[in-house]
From Swiss-Prot:
Entry-linked CDD domains: PEPCK_ATP (cd00484)
Bound cofactor: record note: Binds 1 Mn(2+) ion per subunit.
Protein name in the entry: Phosphoenolpyruvate carboxykinase (ATP)
Originating species: Pasteurella multocida (strain Pm70)
Main location: cytoplasm
NCBIfam families attached to this UniProt entry: pckA, PRK09344.1-1, PRK09344.1-2, PRK09344.1-3
Gene: pckA
Subcellular location: Cytoplasm
Amino acid sequence: MTDLNKVINELGALGIHDVKEIVYNPSYEQLFEEETKPGLEGYEKGIVTQSGAVAVDTGIFTGRSPKDKYIVLDDKTKDTVWWTSDAAKNDNKPMTQDTWKSLKGLVTEQLSGKRLFVIDAFCGANADTRLSVRIVTEVAWQAHFVKNMFIRPTEAELVGFKPDFVVMNGSKVTNPNWKEQGLNSENFVAFNLTEGVQLIGGTWYGGEMKKGMFSMMNYFLPLKGIASMHCSANVGEKGDVAVFFGLSGTGKTTLSTDPKRQLIGDDEHGWDDDGVFNYEGGCYAKTIKLSPENEPDIYKAIKRDALLENVVVRADGSVDYDDGSKTENTRVSYPIYHIDNIVTPVSKAGHAKKVIFLTADAFGVLPPVSKLTPEQTKYYFLSGFTAKLAGTERGITEPTPTFSACFGAAFLSLHPTQYAEVLVKRMEAAGAEAYLVNTGWNGTGKRISIKDTRGIIDAILDGSIEKAEMGKLPIFDLAIPTALPGVDPAILDPRDTYADKAQWQAKAEDLAGRFVKNFEKYTTNDEGKALVAAGPKA
């Protein structure tokens, strides 16, 4: 049994005092009762749906709030963090010690004198590099979310549990002094790497806790030579591992959830001397337009203990997955064992042989699949191109092109080239091949079908793409197959999907120019300059 007085004293040391009661690492049964009990109001209230899963609303924040993210500037971070600058805008904004103290006071005061949920869990499936994380919240469903998403310790692992990082979620409190402090708004997601603390205020969105710890793994692991990746991963019967990089909405969760392969994880992984390992104990899947036909595994995972966010629940308790009226970024979190075909008992496997970059090209220019050279691998990894899809972040609803370094710039704590170097080293050591897969649109104006994309992924994983005859796509100089089993041959060359090929040419020149302009920020050193030739020619 965990000594709750010890936990109370540890919270006291952080500034949380007069704790009424601690609900420590509650069971799913207990969480279900807590989040659905009568009398809960507003965003604390959970609704039981027909599937048995509980649905909650996260309020005005239906996605992360990157503009409200800060890291305390101190001796540890000043020369290591990839700080935002005019040349390279990112979400790592510096915060002073004084502002940090003020925000910490707000959050600890909010959590004091309350009945608190405390979840102790791990981030990272490898015992020697994992973070021991303690999450403190007054909201039952937020405790449920982190129980789903982080790795659940055994009773033995909880004995003498010592957190490396504490997440204090004060979603009910906002910062009245934000203007004087020069912050973006009254809401905040702030990190102090020296103290090992994350503070959340004003936003109820569960993903801030998950992605907050991902940003921290992205700080600590590459400094140890371990690749830290915004990707999903799975493994075949022969032990062949594949990783799928991609931004939100490009198909990471969908495409790695494959009945023929065991899932390692759907979003965040490390790659060390032993192989690829998951950071998480759950999945966080988008549910907009979810159907049992297209995504049977995810659909089936939505049952008791799963937690739905911002979906529309009908009067009879059924869920309308097609309704995006609250947000296009409707989500479900569930423990990873809700998927039948997973790697057990620990979510890790060997070295990756296939590295797949997923992009959703709103321009209709890129081919559905191309095989990359080592130089192109670095170029497209650093470019991290996709179309931002509807609603995965606050204030974005239409597809617009975006370049996000390493397919996850929002979560990078170090300079992007550090991630590229570590990844390519790991790939070279393992003899891994890289592919660029476009799950977006083509000249027909429609999105490439999930059936064709799955056929492409199968061809990569079973090696048949290696036997295919290859052509070259001009401007981008990408190697593209002329035919693949189970894939509509008419889509493999994007030029063929346009009534007039000149249309493709014009769009391709436009997109190539955007790639070139974006990549300028990496050409300040020789390594970056050397990669320019691997990119498109504007």
